[in-house]
Amino acid sequence: KTYTVQWNLNDSAPAGHPASNPNTAASYTVLDADITVSPATRPGYTFLGWYDNPGLTGTPVTTLRTMDAENKSYYAKWDTTPITYPITYVLNDSTPAGHPATNPAANLMSYTVLTNGGGNINVVPALRNGYTFGGWYDNPSFSGSPINSFSAMDAAPKTFYAKWSSANSYTVTYTLNDGTPAGHPATNPN
């Protein structure tokens, strides 16, 4: 005989914070091996376990015992304490020395998924005298596109790297005065 398995993620409130369930078993038979129950994930929440009752009481279930020979319903329990994730800004201003960069106060140093409601968090350009800001990147090699904002639903620590180019670029042109005497052209030693 086949028995059903129902997974209740308990993720309807607040809206916009859907959970993900790695458990795919929708049914089992008594002849099946016991099934190890995996934790669910939900951005901004800590998973506290699967319970066999909607009141979320007792001990969390870690194994679906197939010898029980009955339909099963499991309920996810979440810690709703907001989780705060750090944001690190690497200013890349050590060379040349004497040109420190500043990170505007408008840039958040951390974010909380539940507080920020899943919206976008903007990243403000840094400032450095004599340099043009080329953007914040999520990698030190500056590959990909610059980051102007990110989703609070990313629910992970962030590190952004500042890219700079010199704002004071000059072109030097040498004009050689080699018109006379004839046959003796001037040369540029540079």
What are these language model-derived features?
Residues 1-190:
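Secondary-structure capping and domain/repeat boundary segments
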